[in-house]
Amino acid sequence: MEIQEIIKNMTLEEKSHLVNGATFFGSYGIDRLGVPRMQLLDGATGMNLEQVFGDMTEYEDWSNAEERKQIDADTSKPVNMIGSTRLVHVIEHYFEPEKLSEDEKVLYGWVKKHMDVRLQGKDYAPGCYPPGILLGCTWNPEVIRKVGEALGLECCVYGVHFLLGPNVNILRDPRNGRLFEGYSEDPCVVSKLAPEIVKGIQSYGVSATVKHYAANSQETNRVGIDETISKRALEEIYFPGFRACVKEGGTKSIMNAYNRINGVRCTESAWLLEEKLRKDFGFDGMVMSDWGAVLDPAKALAGGTDLAMPGPGEPQAIYDAVKAATLSEEKVDQACERVLTAIKWITENYKKEEVDKLPVDEIIKQTDEAAYEAACEGIVLLKNDAACPLAKHTKIALLGSGHAQMLECGSGSAGIDTSRHGDVAAEFARYFDVVDEAQAEYVVMIGIVPGMEGNDRKTLALADEDLAVLKRLAQAGKNVILVLNTCGPIDMREIDTDNVKAVFATFLPGMAGAKALSDMIAGEVNPSGKLTITFPERIEDMPTYMNFPGDGYHVSYGEGIYVGYRYYDKKKLRPRYPFGYGMSYTTFDCKLVDAAVDGDTIKVHTTVENTGKVAGSEVIQIYIHDPYSTLAKPEKELKAFEKVKLAPGEKKDVTFAIAIRDLASYDMDLEQFAVEEGYYDILAATSSAAEDVFGETRIYLDVKSPYSYSVDTQLKVICEDDALLEAADSAWAAEGWDIGLIRNNYQYSPQKSLREILVYLDAHLRTEEKVAHFIAAFEENVRTIKKK
């Protein structure tokens, strides 16, 4: 595929079509030029059959199918099947067609005929994988990459070319309806983990589509809501995950967001899509819109949106804009080039032929293992009053909304219809005697809270029916193992009663969730997950409490950079469960050995020893605290982590190399990142809680920065530091100048610098020679003063 040759031979009409979707989840193909149609599909939790089947009814033309004539009296008009009741039922019961009506069976037969062609006759149900919130809690890049590989493999099975994920938006507020799709409230976690799922997906020649760029952090009024966000918060909190997926993950596609940022739609923002994404991050792939996010096709294309979805789009709007000279054809050509470049990469790397040769059993084995390993490493043990693991044959009752089948995934784009579900009762029966409540020694209570695209949560409460059961169990004094099968954090105040002996957060654990949970409660698997989002003590404590979901179509990100634990630390608020927290069935002895600057990195040496009787994993977390910063900063920020697996009695050395550039903060006045010289505290911990910091030491960074002491330093800084003031006084007085001028300006204009007050000297006293001599003397004096 010679891209420039194709563009040269395309008509303007064809170009206008290429930059718009052709069907709801399909791109535009140009047969005469050898440009294939591409299949797009959500998401990063598996194959969304609603989208596969719905799109199939468009491009395979169900409207004119012979089968349709059997069940529709009037076939003279095209019919849109996406979202139709008939198709919804076929999707829900695709793996149990006996439950369909006779008319639905006709549609089912037509769909299956086309699916058999696509799947090469394979009888294969898609997997359902844990979403980002649980993957984040694994703190394990390798596990996440394996999930990505499973997704890439399944994309090849189902003929999918662009997988619409991962979602790397920061978990700003636990009430966000799509919270479960994201990885963490912390940009370091997102930046280290999300690129791995991208690599896994793309290892099969499938393009990942990192979304939603940028700051798509709520569902309320999501289409067009205007978010007021400081540039510092964007640069330090909301951009790093996308930057990492570009630089480290090599993603071939980015999806922009519905919202506006500081007044400009993400689909139309040249600053966001060209200046930041392409010039700053180095992205050279294709930008597609979220579905229906483009309101002005010409403006969106001019701003940097290459492909407007869904289809059929508005190619005529592009055509007309070029003809009216309000959009240049060169800009259209640029978008076409980006779309074609992505298509070319896929056609050259796509492994469908290879995958089609694999036995179904082998595909199932690989995908099952990926889902199970992720669930095992991501489920978090939050409380354990010596209850777990339970002894084999303990009598248990299974209660709660998830007692028969756990909530394995969210709904909407991340929804998965499959026959590969975990049977909760069967999984627990492998170890325990499952009895009714009256006979049970323990009740395993699986409470749910679903996540849903398009709607945010109003509260952090469990479902009402689950709250009622927990209240009854508390009154009866029944021993409870509480399972939070939820889309995010829960208000624990009313439910964490004395009779609740253990609490597990499974979030939405995917198809292997029930197996992983039962193995964990039985002690076959040692919990090793750690939270990547804070559980607040109460909703009023949250940093976003006053700024979510905003007023109508406006929301202020008033917390700035103080998202999650950064806010709780700053406000000295104790959450219910802190960021980075998670328990184990074993114990660990962790030590910080030393930390030192080594070239352009900070080397941090730690040790961790398993002092218990069973194998387990600990997550060593390295935080940085800047005690004397010029800019306001959080009390600490996560900069590195590693999950370490240890046999009983085993001890390992764990060394971190933190790039000095990773300590940079964004200065909005200077409009740049800068690392300030001075002292930094290195904190080694097993969570963000103060009591989990096992070692602390201080280093000094001797770097040149915009904040280095000079004649441009503010008088406030100079006059409030004895060493600096002495350096200024001696250099000033050496020129015969009155040091009282420094004091006087400090009192009334402390924001001014030494350079700025030179103008107040009499002209005969501030000759060029004297000024130059003073500057040289002062800067020599401060050269040896260590910056706080």
Enumerate the language-model features and the residues they cover.
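Glycoside hydrolase catalytic-domain context in secreted enzymes
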Residues: 1-665, 679-684, 688, 773, ...
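Short, solvent-exposed coil/turn linker segments
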Residues: 6, 328, 423, 436, ...
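Thiotemplate assembly-line natural product biosynthesis machinery
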Residues: 374, 721-724
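Generic detector of short, aliphatic-rich beta-strand segments that form the cores of beta-sheets
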Residues: 577, 697-698, 728
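Terminal connector regions
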Residues: 660-705
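Intrinsically disordered, low-complexity regulatory regions in eukaryotic proteins
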Residues: 694, 705, 717-718, 725-788
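Low-complexity, Pro/Ser/Thr- and charge-rich linker/hinge segments at domain boundaries
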Residues: 700-720
